[in-house]
């Protein structure tokens, strides 16, 4: 009997354990990374970045019809089930306004990354249209290569370079442009030292030495910023005021629950009309996202 992962959204495709034979059929290169655990069961070495990348290629091909996906070495290799959960919970949030999950939603992904993970899942699951912003030239080029390598995505996903290092929405949301929602996986750590310490904890949990490569990777702008996620999301909240009439819902992942109180205080200060928290769980990991809007319920129900 296959065990279910606790806490995933009901529509998440990843409730069951990985079906490695099916995934190898979707991406044959994965076969080279399969090993046996002490119980004699097939698994992969999650400490090997190339194995994790091959697993992601297989998951995206098998579940989301993504035929071409690759990221440069050293960039964040995201856990697909958790990223899918954010998309499904966001769909539920939008459905509260319209009565059903909108099929023509326009979504802005802040810091879409080299992996383009949120647009890939959102396009396949709901047919949404995405704009992905990215500040890193290398990550932007990687994301564009993914779009160009998959027929049909060029009509659903457009990418936009953020050229201002201190801006989030400014320079990305154009005049007269509207979005049903924004989403973001903000940098969590507040310094390079903190990011390294977090990486070392992950390595210890995997039983690895200090010189081992970290399986999920991550560049500086993906992992840390001055002040950590509270500072980043706070800036996002302040900037969102300027686009209050152009975006129905602003949202962001929040890694730590104790980071919520200062964010709630700031949302009250800037005059957010509605604030929502969505709790999520992937296995033992608890996470959440917050959403805020400057529009009342009636205004959000009306099309732009």
Curated annotation (Swiss-Prot):
SUPFAM superfamilies: S-adenosyl-L-methionine-dependent methyltransferases. The keyword rRNA processing applies. The keyword Cytoplasm applies. PANTHER family: RNA N6-ADENOSINE-METHYLTRANSFERASE METTL16, SAM-DEPENDENT METHYLTRANSFERASE. Specifically methylates the adenine in position 1618 of 23S rRNA. This is Ribosomal RNA large subunit methyltransferase F. It comes from Klebsiella pneumoniae (strain 342). It catalyses: adenosine(1618) in 23S rRNA + S-adenosyl-L-methionine = N(6)-methyladenosine(1618) in 23S rRNA + S-adenosyl-L-homocysteine + H(+). GO terms for biological process: rRNA base methylation. InterPro entries: METTL16/RlmF, rRNA_lsu_MeTfrase_F, SAM-dependent_MTases_sf. GO terms for cellular component: cytoplasm. Its EC number is 2.1.1.181. It is found in: Cytoplasm. Keywords: Cytoplasm, Methyltransferase, rRNA processing, S-adenosyl-L-methionine, Transferase. CDD domains: AdoMet_MTases (cd02440). It comes from the Bacteria. Gene3D superfamilies: Vaccinia Virus protein VP39. Pfam families: Methyltransf_10. Belongs to the methyltransferase superfamily. METTL16/RlmF family.
